[in-house]
């Protein structure tokens, strides 16, 4: 992320940042106003192909981010989500979508549609209950 931070204005909150910790409403406002929202998993999550809750929060808010875990493909097809598999590719894709915000919308819409229709508590519990023997 450091190359992007050097080239673009950013609003970072959290430990060891100039802003420090932010409350939930402030965090939501930062995400809503961002051109791109980083979705960077811990190395262990990437290794296990996990997908942290930040992914879901960002897209639920109608924002966009490049994911760094192949675990995104467990939920979405390649035409529905943008995934980078190296730091260089992550920077390259992030910069592309910062400069081309209009290209984000199809991904946001596809992911939100699937969240509404498939990845919610109602769907999950119905699926669990239907499959209990």
Functional labels for PLM-detected ranges:
Residues 1-78, 125:
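Nucleotide-sugar donor-binding catalytic core of glycosyltransferases
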Residues 22, 85-88:
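Short beta->alpha linker loops
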Residues 30, 93-96, 131:
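CheY-like receiver
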Residues 54, 93, 110-111:
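Short, hydrophobic/aromatic alpha-helical segments in well-folded domains
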Residues 78-84, 96:
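A short acidic/histidine/glycine-rich donor-binding loop in glycosyltransferase catalytic cores
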Residues 87-103:
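C-terminal "capping" alpha-helix adjacent to the active site of nucleotide-linked donor transferases
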Residues 98-132:
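A charged, aromatic-enriched C-terminal amphipathic alpha-helix characteristic of glycosyltransferases
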């Amino acid at each position: 992320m450091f190359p992007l931070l050097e080239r673009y204005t950013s609003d970072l909150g959290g430990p060891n940042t100039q802003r420090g910790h932010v409350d939930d409403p402030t965090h939501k406002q930062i995400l809503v106003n961002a051109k791109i929202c980083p979705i960077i998993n811990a190395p262990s999550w990437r290794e296990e192909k996990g997908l942290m809750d930040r992914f879901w929060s960002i897209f639920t808010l109608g924002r966009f981010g490049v994911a760094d875990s192949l675990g995104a493909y467990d939920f979405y097809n390649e035409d529905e989500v943008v995934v980078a598999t190296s730091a260089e590719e992550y920077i390259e894709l992030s910069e592309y979508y910062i400069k081309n915000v209009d290209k984000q919308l199809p991904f946001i819409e596809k992911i939100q549609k699937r969240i509404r229709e498939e990845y919610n508590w109602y769907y999950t519990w119905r699926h669990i209950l239907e499959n209990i023997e």
